[in-house]
Amino acid sequence: MRYLLVDRIMALEPGNKITGVKNVAMSEDFLEFHFPKNPIMPGIMLLEALIQLSGWLDAASSDFRKWFLVSRVLKCSFYGFVFPGDQVELTVSVGPAPSHDLKIYSGAARVNGKRKIKAEFQGNLVDLETIEEVEEQKRFFQILTRSG
């Protein structure tokens, strides 16, 4: 199963920063087992949402020629739980690159202004056409940004 963890892109500064939203619904299948009597969004899914948002930043900044693939999580801290019904505000910024072929991002997720995760991760850009249908990604981006 493929998880799409960004429900809306709210703002974009090409090559620099992106903000988005994840709405956590009770119907999310990962909540069935995490945990049945007290469902919370797994922290790794919050990290994945930040990583997916990084991909959208690189796609939009490269006219949908590139996509970010994470290779390493450098730092990650969690600060409380995310529950069904929460709206998670996601922010990702480009950090200083240690080399030409590596990118570093820092990201955070908040619910009602309270930080839930802070992370720094690195990876590489790949040609989008090698992993996704470019036109489909452009159409999906229009839906996420409500620009279509």
What are these language model-derived features?
Residues 1-41:
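Catalytic strand-loop segment that frames the active site of acyl-thioester-processing enzymes
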Residues 3-5, 88, 103:
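Hydrophobic core residues within well-ordered beta-strands of beta-rich domains
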Residues 7-10, 74, 79, 93-95:
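Conserved positions in beta-strands of structured domains
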Residues 22, 91-94:
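Short, hydrophobic/aromatic-enriched beta-strand segments in well-ordered soluble domains
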Residues 34-42, 46-56, 70:
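Compact, glycine-rich, soluble single-domain proteins
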Residues 53-89, 119-126:
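Hydrophobic beta-strand-centered segment that forms part of the acyl-chain substrate-binding groove
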Residues 84-86, 93-148:
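HotDog/MaoC-like acyl-thioester-processing domains
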